[in-house]
């Protein structure tokens, strides 16, 4: 469940509580931004695997910044996405005044307006694997995304809440990839 208790009653998320208190709110992950961990801070859905619905809920959530992967759940099938309802959430977000960054955009934010960054169709690459690509094809690192969020959220005098997840370490662990786990862990020092 995302944003529900075991009896399927909606519950306020941590992100919603921070917004109600007047804080700025951001989410950064190297997984899909619609994946269970980041989604539990803004979404309300009984099925954590229904990432099409979760993506649509991100557009409606009171969020200042969301950076990660998962572009496929924001685009319709005819645009090489996974959305079967035909909605193009990238365009919808832009129509609402949200700045949307995609794969080759440089993550930067001055803290003004709303920013969504979708830097990969699914999860961002493992840190170990990403180093083998030419620089022009590499995903932004978790450290770059974190600095972007911190630079923008810390502007002004309002407090902020930032959920920062290095979720690829979990994926490497599920795959019994010791080198991947170590590489992901070492990147936290950045």
Give residue ranges: language-model regions:
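Surface-exposed loop and adjacent secondary-structure segments within mature catalytic domains
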Residues: 1-7, 11, 15-145
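Active-site His/acidic residue clusters
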Residues: 36-41, 122-134, 149, 157-190
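Alpha-helix C-cap/termination motif
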Residues: 61, 155-156
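An active-site-proximal beta-strand-loop segment
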Residues: 152
